[in-house]
Amino acid sequence: MLLLLARCFLVALASSLLVCPGLACGPGRGFGKRQHPKKLTPLAYKQFIPNVAEKTLGASGRYEGKITRNSERFKELTPNYNPDIIFKDEENTGADRLMTQRCKDKLNALAISVMNQWPGVKLRVTEGWDEDGHHSEESLHYEGRAVDITTSDRDRSKYGMLARLAVEAGFDWVYYESKARIHCSVKAENSVAAKSDGCFPGSATVHLEQGGTKLVKDLSPGDRVLAADDQGRLLYSDFLTFLDRDEGAKKVFYVIETREPRERLLLTAAHLLFVAPHNDSGPTPGPSPLFASRVRPGQRVYVVAERGGDRRLLPAAVHSVTLREEAAGAYAPLTADGTILINRVLASCYAVIEEHSWAHRAFAPFRLAHALLAALAPARTDGGGGGSIPAPQSVAEARGAGPPAGIHWYSQLLYHIGTWLLDSETLHPLGMAVKSS
């Protein structure tokens, strides 16, 4: 009963916090204060994002076979009749309107961005699903997972920005392919890479208050791990639970490496870490939360440095960003302070939304309930026979039972509320693969 009441309280309070997200992003230099608006940079000619081959797991994934009108998979394609999109349809068969649902969703989001960027201009699709064999072998056009696009006015000076808007709309791979068009593609609907959640590999390490390190996968409630407060000061924070835990997961991780000092952090695309401002002098904004998929060489992340016997966080330039597929499991630890040092690099405990402060406030009810249950449950007994009444789940975890596998129910709750209240572009396209509880 106590656990049920706690859950009801959490649902109500979390909903109220998410309805007014603006309360979470005031001015200041603390961690998690993201700058707005975001400046968009056009793609250069022949540039592609992400900087990997199209048919790799880190982009749109492998080719799964050509779809014809007579194949069983033809039902996977859906027509797009969005009036804000112009379809060239040079074949006069309507083929260019056919695409997977994921491709359709991204294309519709891009159409809105185009009209906002250039009033009076619409998105134009020159090629969608192809059934005539006009493309290279294993082209994703044959699966309805790729589109070639321009603007309706065919102004080529706009195409670099059009490509950037496609990236922001959530296409899994965008290529400024030629002076005449932009090529975009998406992952397959059933792809294991379609959702990455926000996690670290089980082989990642954290620093413990009592000294030494521990693998992320071995963390248990009661551990105190190295983290940072909202001013960037190092401290030890209570590990509360895993927001996601999948021991057998095979994930694609972004590998972010620095040279001075030499550190390496692996995390999934939708996870947040903190990037230092370009200029530390003057009244500049504080560190910004950034999706791992958006980190680029030359940006600076925060690492632990030892100077004169003093340990502090210092910005270190990112030397390289690569992709690696690992089968070491995937873990998303939550601390009381919402931050954690993984492999000596500062990261957020949150993912999916690029607003650390919003996420941390949304988890305030969970932290409060966790503290109350931990304080009350150990003292509960049956009063007669001396036997203990079973403790709520969160307290049982603290007694060594360990958190359950999968995505935490509170994370799923916030994600569903977020999809109702927030614009789809606010959420990372590789956000959460919600599992049934």
From Swiss-Prot:
Q: What Enzyme Commission number(s) does the record list for this chain?
A: 3.1.-.-
Write out the tissue specificity statement of the associated record: Expressed in the node, notochord, floor plate, and posterior limb bud mesenchyme.
Keywords in alphabetical order, please.
Autocatalytic cleavage, Calcium, Cell membrane, Developmental protein, Endoplasmic reticulum, Glycoprotein, Golgi apparatus, Hydrolase, Lipoprotein, Membrane, Metal-binding, Palmitate, Protease, Signal, Transferase, Zinc
Q: Where is the lipid attached (Cholesterol glycine ester)?
A: 198
Q: Name one GO biological process term.
A: male genitalia development
Q: Is this entry keyworded rRNA processing?
A: no
Instruction: Enumerate the PROSITE patterns for this protein.
Output: INTEIN_N_TER
Where is lipid attached as N-palmitoyl cysteine? 25
Any one GO molecular function term = laminin-1 binding
Site described as Involved in auto-cleavage, positions?
Answer: 268
Q: Where is this site: Cleavage?
A: 198-199
Q: What class of enzyme is it?
A: hydrolase
Which first-to-last residue range defines the signal peptide? 1-24
| InterPro entries, A to Z | Hedgehog, Hedgehog_Hint, Hedgehog_sig/DD-Pept_Zn-bd_sf, Hedgehog_Signaling, Hedgehog_signalling_dom, Hint_dom_C, Hint_dom_N, Hint_dom_sf
Identify the residues that bind Zn(2+): 141, 148, 183
| Gene3D superfamilies referenced in this protein's UniProt entry, alphabetically | 3.30.1380.10, Hedgehog/Intein (Hint) domain
- Whether Transport counts among this entry's keywords is no
List the carbohydrate attachment sites. 279
**One GO cellular component term:** glutamatergic synapse
Query: What positions does the entry give for Ca(2+) 2 binding?
Result: 91, 127, 130, 132
Location of motif Cardin-Weintraub in this chain is 33-39
Family statement drawn from the similarity comment of this UniProt entry: Belongs to the hedgehog family.
Quote the subunit structure annotation: Interacts with HHATL/GUP1 which negatively regulates HHAT-mediated palmitoylation of the SHH N-terminus. Interacts with BOC and CDON. Interacts with HHIP. Interacts with DISP1 via its cholesterol anchor. Interacts with SCUBE2. Interacts with glypican GPC3.
Q: What is the name of the protein in this document? A: Sonic hedgehog protein
* Species: Rattus norvegicus (Rat)
